[in-house]
């Protein structure tokens, strides 16, 4: 049954009446015929989960786009629903690079999504750069002093302390 399309960070998945649906339906039927009833499952994820799945994957160096985030969000949801064993291996199909949809990441960091997306950023996913030294501080400090001051500020930002040996 065709569905109404709404704004989505996973635009490629938001197709109201995909031409490939009859083929997918046939493949699912064949999969269940071979594996038995209930071996094929579908989970639904929300926009918030999709964008945060992408950010989580990217934070760990996987360079995923929003569709990759959707895959990861679906995996998390499937595990929560008990559709997978805790240690079961999963392979995710993340087909595009994060740069393709970098605007969605920027909207998340800036909290500028239009209301239709129903996405509210969470602080723990906002990985925005922070200045260590202002431009004025940088130009007023000569080489070695700049390096020492930048190092000191980074230590403070990270909450590090001197370790006694």
Per-segment meaning from a language model:
Residues 47-104:
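Claisen-condensing/thiolase-fold acyl-transfer catalytic domains that form or cleave C-C bonds
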Residues 1-63, 108-165:
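Active-site/ligand-binding loops adjacent to catalytic centers
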């Amino acid at each position: 049954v065709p569905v109404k399309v709404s704004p989505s960070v996973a635009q490629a998945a938001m197709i109201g009446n995909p031409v490939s649906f009859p083929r997918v339906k046939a493949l699912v039927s064949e999969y269940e015929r071979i594996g038995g009833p209930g071996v094929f499952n579908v989970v639904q994820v929300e926009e918030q989960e999709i964008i945060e799945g992408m950010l989580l994957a990217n934070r760990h160096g996987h360079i995923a786009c929003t569709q990759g985030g959707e895959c990861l969000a679906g995996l998390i949801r499937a595990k929560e629903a008990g559709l997978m064993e805790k240690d079961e291996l999963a392979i995710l199909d993340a087909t595009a690079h994060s740069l393709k949809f970098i605007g969605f990441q920027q909207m998340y960091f800036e909290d500028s999504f239009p209301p239709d997306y129903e996405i509210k950023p969470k602080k723990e996913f906002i990985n925005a750069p922070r200045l260590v030294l202002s431009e004025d501080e940088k130009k007023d400090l000569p080489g070695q002093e700049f390096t020492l001051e930048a190092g000191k500020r980074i230590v403070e930002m990270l909450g590090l302390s001197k370790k006694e040996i």
